[in-house]
C-alpha cells in the first residue's frame, strides 16, 4: 500500500516592525482598525484653521453649524440616525486635517451626507442633498422657500460636492468606518438592569446625539462615550447607580475621561447660538488676509501686479537717456556729419563694388533715360495734373518724365535754400553740364553718368515735385531752340 504524502500547513509569515516577511522578501502592511480613527492630543491644537488665523471659538461655532446642517438635512432626507452620526464624525475628522478658511463647510457637509449615506447603505441622490441644503439655507436667511433652478450654478455646486467627497476619502485614507455607541448604551443599561426605564434610555440617547456636535467622537472610543452619556442621564434624572466600586469601571472607562466628556457636552448648552453671517464674514476676512500674505511672499501686490522694490531692481531713472533726449541728439548739427562718415564706411563694404547708394541712383537715372518712349510712357505713373506735363517735343517729354521719376525716388532732405532766382540759375547750369557730359560719353549702364561733384550736389538738393517739374519745363523751352536741329544717338532712339 502506497504511503499518502502528508500536506504540511504553510508557515505563517514572520512579522517585524518594518512589515511582513514572506519568503525572502519583506512587504509593508497597513492596519485598518478603529484605533487609528482617534486623533492624538498633539494634533488637537493648533488645528489647521487656527494656523490660518481663526480663533478657537470661531472654529467651534463652524463645527456646530456644520453638524446642525448635516442633522437637519438628514431628517429631511429621511436618513437613519446612524448615517447622520457617521456624516458628523467624518465632518470633524476632515477639519482636523484641513482648514475652514480654505474649504467651505457647507460643501463639505453636503459631501459628508452623500458619503455617509453610501457607507450606511442608505444612499441618496446628490440632487436631493443639494436641494435640501438649499431649502435650509433659505429658511436660515428667513426668506420664502423657492425651488432650486437647474442652471450653471447648480452644476458647479454639484461638481464641488463630488470633488469634496473624493477629497474627504483621500484625506482620511479611505478609513471611514465609525463605531457608534447607540447599541452600546442599550447593552450597558441591560447589564445595569435599567433597560426598562425608557426615560433613562432616551435621555442617554439624546446626550449621545448632542455629543456629535463636539469633538469627543474623535478623541475617545465609543465605550467611554456610552458610559459618559449614561452617567449624565442618571445625574439629570437623579437616579442612583452602583458606586462601590463605580459601575463604569466594569466597562473599562476611567473617571477622568467621563468627566472630560461630560464637561465638553455641558459647555455645548451654555454657548450662544452661532451667527452664520458673522462667521461667514470672519472666514472671508481670513481668506483675503491669507491671499495677500501669499502674494506678498511672491513679491506681488494684492491686485496681482508685481511690486516695485525700493532697494535694487529695475528703476526707470537708471536709463542712460530718455526717448526725448535721443530725438534732440538726432537734430544736433554734428549728427549729419557723423552719419555721413558712417555711410562712407558702409559704402566701402557694400556689395555694390564700392559704389555708394547715390551712384547707384545716378545709374538708375541714366538707365531710365535710355529707355524707349513707349516704355517710359507705359511705366510712368499717371497724375491728375496732365496740363503741366505737356511739352512740344516727345523726346524731351520722355526725358523729363524719366528724370522726374528718378528724382522722386530720392529721399527728401530738409535744407535752407536761397532765393528762387538763384535756385533756378543753379538748376539751369547744372542741367546744361549734365547734357554736355552725356553727349561725350556713351549710354552704357556700367558707368556712372554723373561726376562725383554732381552726385554730391544732387545729394544736397531738395525740392517739392512741382518745383522740379516747373524747372524742367523752363529748361526744355530755353534749350530746345539751341539744340533742336542737332542729331544725337540718345535722341534718335525716341524719334519715329
UniProtKB/Swiss-Prot annotation:
Annotated region (Cyclin-like 1), positions in chain: 68-170
Chain segments carrying region RS: 363-406
SUPFAM superfamilies tied to this protein: Cyclin-like (SSF47954)
Region (Cyclin-like 2): 183-267
Pfam assignment, any one: Cyclin_N
Biased composition (Basic and acidic residues): 322-347, 469-478
Chain intervals with Basic residues compositional bias: 358-392, 412-426, 434-446, 456-468, 479-496
Main location: nucleus
Keywords carried by this UniProt record: Cyclin, Nucleus, Repeat, Transcription, Transcription regulation
UniProt subcellular location: Nucleus speckle; Nucleus, Nucleoplasm
Listed InterPro entries: Cyclin-like_dom, Cyclin-like_sf, Cyclin/Ssn8, Cyclin_C-dom, Cyclin_N
Region (Disordered): 301-496
Cysteine disulfide partners in this protein: none
GO MF term list: cyclin-dependent protein serine/threonine kinase regulator activity
GO biological process, one term: regulation of transcription by RNA polymerase II
Cellular component, GO annotation: nuclear speck; nucleus
PANTHER family: CYCLIN
Role according to the record: Involved in pre-mRNA splicing.
The record's note on its domains: Contains a RS region (arginine-serine dipeptide repeat) within the C-terminal domain which is the hallmark of the SR family of splicing factors. This region probably plays a role in protein-protein interactions.
Name used for this protein in its record: Cyclin-L1
Amino acid at each position: 500500500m502506497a504511503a499518502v504524502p502528508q500536506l504540511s500547513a504553510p508557515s505563517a509569515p514572520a512579522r517585524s516592525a518594518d512589515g511582513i516577511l514572506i519568503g525572502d522578501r519583506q512587504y509593508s502592511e497597513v492596519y485598518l482598525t478603529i484605533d487609528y480613527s482617534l486623533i492624538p492630543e498633539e494634533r488637537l491644537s493648533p488645528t489647521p484653521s487656527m494656523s490660518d488665523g481663526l480663533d478657537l471659538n470661531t472654529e467651534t461655532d463652524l463645527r456646530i453649524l456644520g453638524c446642525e446642517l448635516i442633522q437637519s438635512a438628514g431628517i429631511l432626507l429621511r436618513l437613519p440616525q446612524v448615517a447622520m452620526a457617521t456624516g458628523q464624525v467624518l465632518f470633524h475628522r476632515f477639519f482636523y486635517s484641513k482648514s475652514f478658511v480654505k474649504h467651505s463647510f457647507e460643501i463639505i457637509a453636503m459631501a459628508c451626507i452623500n458619503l455617509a449615506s453610501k457607507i450606511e447603505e442608505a444612499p441618496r441622490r446628490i440632487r436631493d442633498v443639494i436641494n435640501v441644503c438649499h431649502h435650509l439655507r433659505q429658511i436660515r436667511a428667513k426668506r420664502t422657500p423657492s425651488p432650486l433652478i437647474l442652471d450653471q450654478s447648480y452644476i458647479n455646486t454639484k461638481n464641488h460636492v463630488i470633488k469634496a467627497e473624493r477629497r474627504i476619502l483621500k484625506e482620511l485614507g479611505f478609513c471611514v468606518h465609525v463605531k457608534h455607541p447607540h447599541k452600546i448604551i442599550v447593552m450597558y443599561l441591560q447589564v445595569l438592569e435599567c433597560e426598562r426605564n425608557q426615560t433613562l434610555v432616551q435621555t442617554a440617547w439624546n446626550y449621545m446625539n448632542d455629543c456629535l456636535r463636539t469633538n469627543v467622537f474623535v478623541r475617545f472610543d465609543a465605550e467611554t462615550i456610552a458610559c459618559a452619556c449614561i452617567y449624565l442621564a442618571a445625574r439629570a434624572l437623579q437616579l442612583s447607580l452602583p458606586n462601590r466600586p463605580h459601575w463604569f469601571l466594569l466597562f473599562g472607562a476611567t473617571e477622568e475621561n467621563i468627566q472630560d466628556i461630560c464637561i465638553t457636552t455641558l459647555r455645548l448648552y451654555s454657548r450662544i447660538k452661532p451667527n452664520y453671517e458673522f462667521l461667514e464674514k470672519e472666514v472671508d476676512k481670513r481668506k483675503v488676509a491669507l491671499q495677500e500674505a501669499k502674494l506678498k511672499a511672491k513679491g506681488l501686490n494684492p491686485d496681482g501686479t508685481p511690486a516695485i522694490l525700493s532697494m535694487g531692481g529695475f528703476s526707470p531713472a537708471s536709463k542712460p537717456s530718455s526717448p526725448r533726449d535721443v530725438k534732440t541728439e538726432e537734430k544736433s548739427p554734428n549728427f549729419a556729419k557723423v552719419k555721413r562718415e558712417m555711410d562712407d564706411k558702409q559704402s566701402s563694404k557694400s556689395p555694390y563694388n564700392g559704389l555708394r547708394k547715390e551712384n547707384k541712383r545716378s545709374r538708375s537715372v541714366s538707365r531710365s533715360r535710355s529707355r524707349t518712349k513707349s516704355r517710359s510712357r507705359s511705366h510712368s505713373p499717371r497724375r491728375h495734373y496732365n496740363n503741366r506735363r505737356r511739352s512740344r517735343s516727345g523726346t524731351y517729354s520722355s526725358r523729363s518724365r524719366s528724370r522726374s521719376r528718378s528724382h522722386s525716388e530720392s529721399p527728401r532732405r530738409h535744407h535752407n535754400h536761397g532765393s528762387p532766382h538763384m535756385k533756378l540759375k543753379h538748376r539751369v547750369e547744372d542741367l546744361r553740364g549734365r547734357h554736355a557730359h552725356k553727349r561725350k560719353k556713351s549710354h552704357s549702364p556700367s558707368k556712372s553718368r554723373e561726376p562725383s561733384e554732381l552726385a554730391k550736389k544732387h545729394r544736397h538738393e531738395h525740392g517739392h515735385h512741382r518745383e522740379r517739374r516747373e524747372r524742367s519745363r523752363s529748361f526744355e523751352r530755353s534749350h530746345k531752340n539751341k539744340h533742336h536741329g542737332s542729331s544725337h544717338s540718345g535722341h534718335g532712339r525716341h524719334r519715329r
